[in-house]
């Protein structure tokens, strides 16, 4: 762990340099490929890992090799993963989805911003130096129209976004011919429906049923379509955002790009400090993945941090502000009801959700019902006009394993199920947020309760952390729970970094959290039996057995760390072709010995076979030519 501490000025300067010098970059021995669709000019980006050939025989002077197929993998890095694309953070990313949105002809550009706060910020000349220069003119659904992917799915329409997703979810596995790589153990899916091939129609059907969501605000055309649902690959979210204590716009944009490089399927901007509006604009215009927020955080800033002073009007203005910037999903704590708050009184750790505690304080101070619950239909109307998905927040999630699975937690969950049905009346897409801190033996009940209470809407959980004794290592404690609940059916896992409970994560913390959660998500996909999930594992195992060190590094989730660990003890180039590593050395490597046993067994088989043929030859009289027997 690095002990170097940078000053705030140095941190900002470093982030600014990262942004100024940013260019599309591929992982080692990987290249960007695009898989085309049947319509809509769809080009789905993937990363293809090139592999070296296997030595199968021959001599030192004339070796014989067998080619190994390149392995395609899911890629969240967007244009940042393509060396052929010119990157300019000042201009933002290309608007991939704009032609699809325009072709539907059900939205229109606004003459002015709907949010009073946005109009106020735009009129402030003092913010010019902070403002993103290429502001979009926001769109909204035409009168009487709904522009959500759920609306289209229910109408039987397969959108370009759905076809894009179908290609992406198949991960290019149709390109793989090797039976060794295609081999896969049957999974245990706990009722998940996993087709051998994901089609656009299957995507449409899952969205129409509410079992999956496509977070895709019409004002975020830069995003590459992705899907969150139990019957698809398990996804991972990364949290970024400034606070009143630390971080800047430059650092948050850097963390966004860094997150997509290391596999974040979505990113939540949880900023609570200065310039929230301006920071979010920079993030959205440069994000190839969906962006989520917790609007109550910014609404609280607008009333100077005093929860009691929150109003529906201030919150509504915040929803409009963020929807017209392009936020793809809102976390809304509408299930924290007044009558549930006393249920938390006997908890060891009370209410640990920021949003949940804000709304609980408001309810108690006014002795009124949660205004998010009271105005939920109006929230849905706003979301339907921009296609903002709802992530129904678990404001009463347990903050310690002692409080897991209690009355408050499940009471709120049941209310979230009721709100889900209301949102669906407006064709608004919904996912459900979950805990939290839950010991391993109590995790599965959370998934079962969510499926039953929330009508199979996608589940999105923070971990859960399986023990409370490891500050500094909570990416491990939560990664265990994340892998388990992903296997049981959770659709998206919110990462936890090593800084959880300790401080705001930096760039390296973001990477550590994401790698941990990509492992958890992939382990869950393997356990569920997601088609094609084992291809990369098989390729890695084959490379490992054949001592193809470069391929092992390049197939890893983190090639740089894998290479660095190997080179700590065997830095020479000869170490990259050696048939051993520093753990066992040349005489005790199990795989080298296994290869020798295999070669010996093959030789013995040949020798025994020759002996059998010799005996057969003698038994028939030792004649070179035998007479053909008469029929």
From Swiss-Prot:
Function: Catalyzes the synthesis of the hydroxymethylpyrimidine phosphate (HMP-P) moiety of thiamine from aminoimidazole ribotide (AIR) in a radical S-adenosyl-L-methionine (SAM)-dependent reaction.
This protein's UniProt keywords: 4Fe-4S, Iron, Iron-sulfur, Lyase, Metal-binding, S-adenosyl-L-methionine, Thiamine biosynthesis, Zinc
Binding-site residues for [4Fe-4S] cluster, renumbered to this chain: 581, 584, 589
Catalytic activity: 5-amino-1-(5-phospho-beta-D-ribosyl)imidazole + S-adenosyl-L-methionine = 4-amino-2-methyl-5-(phosphooxymethyl)pyrimidine + CO + 5'-deoxyadenosine + formate + L-methionine + 3 H(+)
EC class of the enzyme, as a word: lyase
A GO molecular function held by the record: carbon-carbon lyase activity
Stated family: Belongs to the ThiC family.
Cofactor binding mode and count: Binds 1 [4Fe-4S] cluster per subunit. The cluster is coordinated with 3 cysteines and an exchangeable S-adenosyl-L-methionine.
Regions annotated as coiled coil: none
Family matches, as NCBIfam families: PRK09284.1, PRK13352.1, thiC
InterPro entries: ThiC (IPR037509), ThiC-associated_dom (IPR025747), ThiC/Bza_core_dom (IPR038521), ThiC/BzaA/B (IPR002817)
Gene that encodes the chain: thiC
PANTHER family: PHOSPHOMETHYLPYRIMIDINE SYNTHASE, CHLOROPLASTIC, THIAMINE BIOSYNTHESIS PROTEIN THIC
Quaternary structure (record): Homodimer.
Amino acids binding Zn(2+): 437, 501
Gene3D superfamilies per record: 6.10.250.620, Radical SAM ThiC family, central domain
Entry binding sites for substrate: 239, 268, 297, 333, 353-355, 394-397, 433, 460
Necessary cofactors: [4Fe-4S] cluster
GO cellular component terms, semicolon-separated: cytosol
Pathway the protein contributes to: Cofactor biosynthesis; thiamine diphosphate biosynthesis
Stored Pfam families: ThiC-associated, ThiC_Rad_SAM
EC number(s) given by UniProt: 4.1.99.17
GO biological process: thiamine biosynthetic process; thiamine diphosphate biosynthetic process
Name this polypeptide is given: Phosphomethylpyrimidine synthase
Natural source organism: Salmonella heidelberg (strain SL476)
């Amino acid at each position: 762990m690095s002990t170097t501490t940078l000053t705030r000025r140095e941190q900002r300067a470093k982030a600014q340099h990262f942004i100024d010098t940013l260019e599309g970059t591929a992982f080692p021995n990987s290249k960007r490929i695009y898989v085309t669709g049947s319509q809509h000019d769809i080009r789905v980006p993937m990363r293809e890992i090139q592999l070296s050939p296997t030595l199968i025989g021959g001599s030192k002077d004339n070796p014989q090799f067998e080619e190994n197929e390149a392995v395609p993998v899911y890629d969240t890095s967007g244009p940042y993963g393509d060396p052929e694309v010119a990157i300019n953070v000042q201009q933002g990313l290309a608007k991939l989805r704009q032609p699809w949105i325009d072709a539907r002809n059900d939205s229109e550009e606004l003459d002015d911003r709907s949010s009073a706060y946005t109009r106020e910020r735009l009129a402030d000349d003092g913010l010019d130096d902070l403002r993103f220069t290429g502001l979009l003119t926001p769109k909204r659904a035409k009168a009487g129209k709904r522009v959500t992917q759920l609306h289209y799915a229910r109408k039987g329409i397969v959108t370009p976004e759905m076809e894009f997703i179908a290609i992406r979810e198949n991960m290019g596995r149709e390109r793989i011919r090797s039976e060794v790589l295609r081999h896969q153990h049957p999974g245990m899916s706990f009722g998940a429906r996993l087709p051998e091939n994901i089609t656009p129609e299957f995507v449409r059907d899952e969205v129409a049923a509410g079992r999956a969501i496509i977070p895709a605000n019409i004002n975020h055309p830069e995003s590459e379509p992705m899907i969150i649902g139990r019957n698809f690959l398990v996804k991972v979210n990364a949290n970024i955002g400034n606070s009143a204590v630390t971080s800047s716009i430059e650092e948050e944009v850097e963390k966004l790009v860094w997150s997509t490089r290391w596999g974040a399927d979505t990113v939540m901007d949880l900023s609570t400090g200065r310039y929230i509006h301006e920071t979010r604009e920079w993030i959205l215009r440069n994000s190839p993945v969906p962006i989520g927020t917790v609007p109550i955080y910014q609404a609280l800033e607008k009333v100077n941090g005093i929860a009691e002073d929150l109003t529906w009007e201030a919150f509504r203005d915040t929803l409009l502000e963020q929807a017209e910037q392009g936020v793809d999903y809102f976390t809304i704590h509408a299930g924290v009801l007044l009558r549930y708050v006393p249920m938390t009184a006997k908890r060891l750790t009370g209410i640990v959700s920021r949003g949940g505690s804000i709304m609980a304080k408001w309810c108690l101070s006014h002795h009124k019902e949660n205004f998010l619950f009271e105005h939920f239909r109006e929230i849905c109307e706003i979301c339907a006009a921009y296609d903002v998905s709802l992530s129904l927040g678990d404001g009463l999630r347990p903050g310690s394993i002692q409080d897991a699975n209690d009355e408050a937690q499940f009471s709120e969950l049941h209310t979230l199920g009721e709100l889900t049905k209301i949102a669906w009346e407006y064709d608004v897409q919904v996912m459900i947020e979950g805990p939290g801190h839950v010991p391993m033996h109590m995790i599965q009940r959370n998934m079962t309760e969510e499926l039953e209470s929330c009508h199979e809407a996608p589940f999105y959980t923070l971990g859960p952390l399986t023990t409370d004794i490891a500050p500094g290592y909570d990416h491990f404690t939560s990664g265990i729970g994340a892998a388990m609940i992903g296997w049981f059916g959770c659709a998206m896992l919110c990462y936890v970094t090593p800084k959880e409970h300790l401080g705001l994560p930096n760039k390296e913390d973001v990477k550590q959290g994401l790698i941990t959660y990509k492992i958890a998500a992939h382990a869950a996909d393997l356990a569920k039996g997601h088609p094609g999930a084992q291809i990369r594992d098989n390729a890695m195992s084959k490379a490992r057995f054949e001592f193809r060190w470069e391929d092992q590094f390049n197939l890893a989730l983190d090639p740089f760390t894998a290479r660095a660990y190997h080179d700590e003890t065997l830095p020479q180039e000869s170490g990259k072709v050696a048939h051993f590593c520093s753990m066992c050395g040349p005489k005790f490597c199990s795989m080298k010995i296994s290869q020798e046993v295999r070669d010996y067994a093959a030789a013995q088989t040949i020798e025994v076979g020759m002996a059998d043929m010799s005996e057969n030859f003698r038994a028939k009289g030792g004649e070179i030519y035998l007479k053909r027997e008469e029929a």
